[in-house]
Structure formats: C-alpha cells, structure tokens
C-alpha cells in the first residue's frame, strides 16, 4: 500500500492490514480456484470428459430453468461474484493507479481469465467457464464500488 494513498485517503485501513488481507485473499483464491490439480497417471480419464463452457450466459440460463440444477447454478454464480468482491476492494488500496472503476474491473477480468486458462492447462476437478469470468468481473466491480463508498464515508 502506497503511503501517498493512505495520506490522501485518511479513512483507508492501515497498510499492514491491507497487505495481510491481500496475502490471505490471494492464498484463498488460489486454493478455491486452482486446486486440486491432478498429476496422476489417470489424467487422461479427466481429459476425455473435460469440455470448457465457452458460450456466455447460455449455460446459466439453461441450468436456472432446470429445477434439479437451479440451486447449484445460482449458488455457483453468486459464489463467483462474492469471490472477487475482496479483489475489487483491495486493488485500489494496494495499487494507487487502479483508482478508477474501469482499471480495477479490467484487472479483475484479466485475473479471472488467467485463472480459467490455468484450469484449462492443468485439469483437475475444475473446468474453464466463461460465465465464471463474467461473474468474477461483476464481483470486482461490486468490490470497487464498496471501496468507494466505505473509504469516502469514513473520511
């Protein structure tokens, strides 16, 4: 956290707290989105059943209409939004250049896309889904808006 950011935003949390939160968040994000990675000999079995979801919103719409999959689909979408809210809040505190919505959302989009690509490169129980990128990006925007509200309100 830049000292100049903290000097300009007296309502910002202490630098050590922001850095600690960022480290914990990064570790949790890695565990939740990338692990477990399968490195065993039976990897081919996972590759054969593996297909990325590349059509935005279609799969969400279909699954939300299906009573058996509705709750799991809704929980997954909400979970993906919630997962990236801390990123949208922490980024402007950590990187002063990311003090604009579009910059922070762009960084969230890039990170989410990188995570999804890593899921394609290292198959495990995860599979890439374009809807995850969309929901994660929305979560980043929500986090940034919360940052704007909370930092300014506390001032």
What does each model-identified segment do?
Residues 138-143:
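C-terminal or internal capping secondary-structure element at the end of a domain, subdomain, or sheet
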Residues 126-135:
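Non-cytosolic membrane-interface motifs at loop->transmembrane helix junctions
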Residues 1-125, 144-155:
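Bulky hydrophobic segments
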């Amino acid at each position: 956290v830049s000292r100049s950011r903290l000097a300009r935003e007296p309502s910002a949390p202490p630098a050590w707290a922001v850095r600690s939160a960022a480290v914990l968040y990064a570790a949790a994000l890695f565990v939740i989105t990338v692990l477990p990675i399968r490195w065993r000999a039976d990897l081919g079995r996972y590759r054969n059943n593996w297909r990325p979801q590349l059509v935005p919103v279609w799969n969400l719409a279909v699954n939300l209409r299906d009573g058996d999959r509705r709750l799991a689909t809704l929980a997954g979408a909400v979970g993906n939004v919630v997962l990236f809210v801390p990123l949208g809040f922490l980024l402007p505190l950590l990187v002063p250049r990311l003090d604009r919505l579009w910059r922070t959302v762009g960084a969230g989009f890039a990170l989410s896309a990188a995570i999804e690509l890593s899921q394609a490169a290292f198959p495990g129980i995860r599979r890439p889904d374009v809807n995850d990128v969309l929901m994660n990006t929305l979560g980043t925007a929500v986090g940034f808006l919360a940052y704007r509200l909370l930092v300014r309100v506390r001032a």
